[in-house]
């Protein structure tokens, strides 16, 4: 079965460990640990790039599957499941599917188009560490793509492998030299036609690689032929572009608006002008 995978901005993974209320940024303890942190590498399929050219879909394209996970924010998640299951399959990652089913039915949500996955995790921020999907070939052969998560949270980092195993999909991991890439989903958007967007955090977090090498990895694993990188914002600690912008279609970018001269507003405007002036 073919899945088009969409990862929500807020996705919660519950599994074999007790979830921690870790923030989106690194804690002081994590910052100290990260200096000597060695990320996990689960070579379940291939740490080489896909063997044929791939295309990463845009978020506005039709989807066949959406991942949510069940630990907190359950009232909101129930609403998401209720609406999404009318349109496509919902993958619910949880520790106890029976309790999830009970909660859904108690809110009047029918148990249709649902799949349940068990996977451990460290934090709530699966938009940042979850799987990415890419396609190759005339038959749209789906592949899962995995990077190194930019947090010292090894269980989070293994969630893409858990999904790939469940869905019986090949996974290609940019986790081993020379293709090892530290990245985060919240700092990556794509237009479906080969153009990718990130803040320059992607360069800062890969100091052993040149920008050209980073572009090459993104091309090999994600099919990105034009990689636009914008300056980070002075007041946004995590520097994820999904905090202030979204691609709506091939020709439209939605950005956050501040009062004139306030906070991150001037840098957002400067970034927008940089894109408009250089990448038509």
What is the predicted role of each segment?
Residues 1-21:
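Bacterial Sec-dependent N-terminal signal peptides
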Residues 20-280:
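The feature marks the mature, well-folded catalytic cores of soluble enzymes
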């Amino acid at each position: 079965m073919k899945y088009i995978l969409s990862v929500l901005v807020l996705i919660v993974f519950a599994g074999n460990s007790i979830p921690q209320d870790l923030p989106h940024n690194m804690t002081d303890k994590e910052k100290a640990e990260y200096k000597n942190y060695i990320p996990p590498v689960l070579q379940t399929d291939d740490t080489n790039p896909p063997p044929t050219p791939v295309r990463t879909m845009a978020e506005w394209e039709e989807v066949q599957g959406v991942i949510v996970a069940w630990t907190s924010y359950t009232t909101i998640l129930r609403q998401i499941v209720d609406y999404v299951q009318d349109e496509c399959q919902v993958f619910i990652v949880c520790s106890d599917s029976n309790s999830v089913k009970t909660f859904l039915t108690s809110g009047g949500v029918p148990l249709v188009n649902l799949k349940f996955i068990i996977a451990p995790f460290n934090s709530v921020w699966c938009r940042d560490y979850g799987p990415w999907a890419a396609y190759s070939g005339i038959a749209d052969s789906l592949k899962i793509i995995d990077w190194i998560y930019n947090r010292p949270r090894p269980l989070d980092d293994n969630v893409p492998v858990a999904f790939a195993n469940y869905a019986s999909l090949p996974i290609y991991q940019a986790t081993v030299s020379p293709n090892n890439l530290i990245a985060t989903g919240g700092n990556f958007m794509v237009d479906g036609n080969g153009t990718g967007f990130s803040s320059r955090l992607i360069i800062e977090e890969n100091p052993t690689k040149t920008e050209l090498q980073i572009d090459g990895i993104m091309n090999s694993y994600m099919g990105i032929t034009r990689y636009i990188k914008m300056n980070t914002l002075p007041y946004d600690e995590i520097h994820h572009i999904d905090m202030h912008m979204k691609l709506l279609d091939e020709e439209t970018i939605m950005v956050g608006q501040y009062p004139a001269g306030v906070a991150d507003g001037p840098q957002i405007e400067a970034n927008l002008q940089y894109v408009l002036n250089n990448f038509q």
